[in-house]
A protein has these predicted regions:
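Interfacial aromatic-anchored transmembrane helix boundaries in multi-pass membrane proteins
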Residues: 22-31, 61-91
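Hydrophobic alpha-helical transmembrane segments
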Residues: 7-12, 36, 54-58, 75-76, ...
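Central hydrophobic cores of alpha-helical transmembrane segments
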Residues: 54-65, 100-110
Length: 173
């Protein structure tokens, strides 16, 4: 019974994440927001089922890659970049503080540059001048830093309010 509940829970999280990404593709203004909301759903799966959250990431990435690319590929690409962070952050937080900051800096740099290159490959007209690469990279780095703070706040909110309100703690008993 417990395995079937876990599978159902993971399916629900995948469906909600896919809907967020579809909304981001339909309304292009919400592309980064939808990727971050889908990543927060991944955080819920990670907090409840630890290692099985990787399956949520993979299934959501495949599903969004199949149908979101028809509208706009940016939310799916941004989810591929932002979605990894809720899975990596607990591992980074277990390291010593200085090494953790170095690893976060490397992730921020790599993901912001990957985002800029992906945007250039998908929408080449958006990066016409060379200084636009730097502006986009700085903006994405700032978004990832704010996303790191959001993860900490959302995790606290999830444990103290949302988990009890949705009765998720009773779901796995």
């Amino acid at each position: 019974m417990k395995k079937s509940r876990e599978i159902a829970f993971l399916g629900i999280i995948c469906a909600i994440s896919a809907v967020f990404l579809l909304l981001g593709a339909a309304f292009e203004v919400l592309d980064i927001t939808s990727a971050i909301l889908a990543s927060l759903m991944l955080l819920i799966a990670h907090e409840e089922l630890k290692g099985k959250a990787v399956l949520v990431y993979l299934v959501t990435a495949v599903i969004s890659g199949l149908y979101v690319f028809a509208f706009s590929p940016l939310p799916a690409v941004e989810y591929a970049i932002f979605g990894l962070y809720p899975l990596i952050k607990p591992l980074i937080d277990k390291t010593p503080k200085v090494l953790g900051y170095i690893l976060k800096g490397v992730y921020i740099l790599a993901s912001s540059l990957t985002s800029v290159v992906a945007i250039y490959l998908i929408v080449p007209s958006s990066v016409e001048k060379p200084y636009m690469f730097a502006i986009y990279a700085i903006v994405f780095a700032a978004v990832i830093i704010l996303f790191d703070l959001l993860i900490v706040r959302f995790k606290r909110y999830y444990y103290f309010k949302l988990r009890g309100m949705l009765r998720i703690d009773r779901f796995f008993k």
